[in-house]
Amino acid sequence: SYGHTFSDYPWHFHQQQAKAGIPNDEKFTHSWKYLILISLSKIILNQDNSLPFNDESREAMSKLEAFIVDAYGSRDPDLTQVFNPQREIRLKPHFELNFKILKAGASAESISIADLPTVIQEVNAQLMKLVLASLNPEHKYFIAFDQLDLGFDNKADDYISRLIGLLLAGRDINIAAKNAQVKFLVTVFLRDDIYNVLRFEDKNKITENFMSLIEWDTPRTTKTLKSLMEKRFSIVASDIDIEQDVKWSDIFNETREMPGHQSKYDHIKDRTYLRPRDMIKFANSALAKFKERLNSPASNTQDDKR
């Protein structure tokens, strides 16, 4: 599996990969597919020790490795540099492409990343064949995208286009993987308020066939962020040889209400907007303050330690 958070991703490089002459909703679809396929190539070449699992897989992996190493100088390339405009990638002898589509002055042997959008559909098609043929059908593979809400601006057309392109790319690759009978899934974690503002032609189909709603603390579910945090507390406790389930009340003293007669859980929940990562940050901040007070000479009471 591989996870993308994009906190330090060079969006300005990706921005230059917009494919011209097609609708805005689709202009980033092919560049997302390329990034996903390169990510999956990294898993194939560096993580799954069961590969190659047969002769077809061995042949596909050999071709895939030759392209990746030739293009990026390593079988484990830095994904933040995939679209670096200073880079060139060799097309021959790795891919059989229609080189007539290259713009004037471009080489059939290699192409600059700046010119990649002119052939990216053909490159993706070849890459797709290689990665799907390489995968072990008994294993499960995941590429996940998260924190796409960082810097969200519903008035920024390119931001919206990038999100739509990612959803379309993930949908297309998931369909291809299913048809190839391999267990590979592209997963995009996106806040529902952001998803709701997206407008594109295939949205209804994606909503009906490819979307799962993950929610907590709503009338529709019994799942809560409190239970999620308790699981994390227990995992941390097991790391220090505490073999027991850790409850929320073991960490936070709920007998003492917050201002406004709120429980500590409701207080934290309201200030983290039901975002798990923000609740984790809040809990870590509370832990840091607890340690400060614990080490303070003025802290002597049990209440100070809850």
Language-model regions, residue ranges each:
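Short, intrinsically disordered, charge-balanced linker/junction segments flanking boundaries
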Residues: 1, 303-306
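P-loop NTPase nucleotide-binding core
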Residues: 1-141, 151, 195, 200
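Amphipathic alpha-helical scaffolding segments
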Residues: 3, 51-63, 160-168, 284-290
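Short secondary-structure boundary/capping segments
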Residues: 17-22, 158-161, 200-207, 289, ...
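Short, solvent-exposed segments of well-ordered alpha helices
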Residues: 23, 27, 114, 118, ...
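Short, solvent-exposed secondary-structure capping/transition elements
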Residues: 41-55, 153-157, 176-182, 198, ...
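Conserved AAA+ ATPase small/helical "lid" subdomain
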Residues: 49-53, 230-299
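The catalytic "switch" region of P-loop NTPases
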Residues: 121-261
